[in-house]
Amino acid sequence: MPRSQRNDNFIDKTFTVIADILLKILPTSNKEKQAFSYYRDGMSAQSEGEYAEALQNYYEALRLETDAYDRSYILYNIGLIHTSNGDHARALDYYYQALERNPSLPQALNNIAVIYHYRGEQALESSQTEISKLLFDKAADYWREAIRLAPTNYIEAQNWLKMTGRF
């Protein structure tokens, strides 16, 4: 049984009902409806920390979805799960894929920056100052682009950029 049919969470259930109504009235193909259903179930599983189930749903949605913009959000969410699981290399791959399809995705740019900043901190702790500088510069590049797209977001990143002279 699909997650959307067994969900006890009121907000998720409300979202599911509204999404089902929209899918019925909007002119979409059955394949697009299936892709959205898998995506929705993936989001629900992800919000409950059921990452393996979420990934299964996202991969199925990715298989069915043909629209590049919609695929970018599926790829972004897969990246989020890999970030949560500590697999930063894999997460970066999915964030980059999301940006290839949708260059105006500031949250992917931000998450890439966060990973590079984290790696910069690790390099600094290992006394690899040159590598840390390169990683921090890379993080700054991605944060500047994210901030350009969403100027009122990422306040901590803006402060870090100013404090480090990278803004």
Swiss-Prot record:
Signal sequence region: none
Any one cellular-component term (Gene Ontology): chloroplast thylakoid membrane
Main location: plastid
Family, per entry: Belongs to the Ycf3 family.
Biological-process GO terms, alphabetical: photosynthesis
Record keywords: Chloroplast, Membrane, Photosynthesis, Plastid, Repeat, Thylakoid, TPR repeat
Cellular localization per UniProt: Plastid, Chloroplast thylakoid membrane
Record InterPro entries: PSI_Ycf3_assembly, TPR-like_helical_dom_sf, TPR_rpt
Functional summary from the UniProt entry: Essential for the assembly of the photosystem I (PSI) complex. May act as a chaperone-like factor to guide the assembly of the PSI subunits.
Keyword Hydrolase part of the UniProt annotation: no
Keyword Calcium: no
Protein name in UniProt: Photosystem I assembly protein Ycf3
Membrane topology type: Peripheral membrane protein
Placement of TPR repeats on the sequence: 35-68, 72-105, 120-153
Domain of life: Eukaryota
Gene name, Swiss-Prot/TrEMBL: ycf3
Cystine connections: none
